[in-house]
Amino acid sequence: MVIAKSNFRDEEYLHPKEEFLRNGHEVITASSTLKESIGRFGTKVTPDIDYKELTTDDFDALVFVGGGGASEYFDSSLAHGLAREAYRNGKVVSAICIAPVILSKAGLLQGKKATVFPDGENDLIKGGAFYTGNPVEVDDRIVTGNGPDAARDFAKKVMEQLK
């Protein structure tokens, strides 16, 4: 799970992580720093790894957590490259809230059904996605969610893609 160094959306990290752990999956938390990351509502997380050190051998699913801080990855060639490599290597690639903008800017949503927090709709459309506005969308190993209320369903859809 990739979180922003600050202002990630707490429940979009905590709820999927809880679902993944409850279902026997290991969770690695990555960020752009190894210093403590603080969510919008005060959740403190010390990342396990700098996202720049991640390789697709480290995970089966890549999850970009939303919240305003996720914008630090919007134009990150490293984040885009990681997402593209994960997809090419058959991994599940996912993002929630505003974070699907990262996948769009990486070119992964071209011709795909996707959703996003309403502020990101235009970015998805510019990237060639078919924006649905649904809480969660799945299209060919790419899972997108539109915000915190969808966090648990989003996690379940990510896990379904792992089967």
Task: Annotate each PLM feature.
Residues 111:
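Exposed beta-strand and adjacent loop surfaces of beta-rich binding modules
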Residues 97:
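Catalytic nucleophile serine of serine hydrolases
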Residues 1-89, 93, 102-108, 121-163:
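Extended, subdomain-level signal for the structured scaffold at the beginning of enzyme domains
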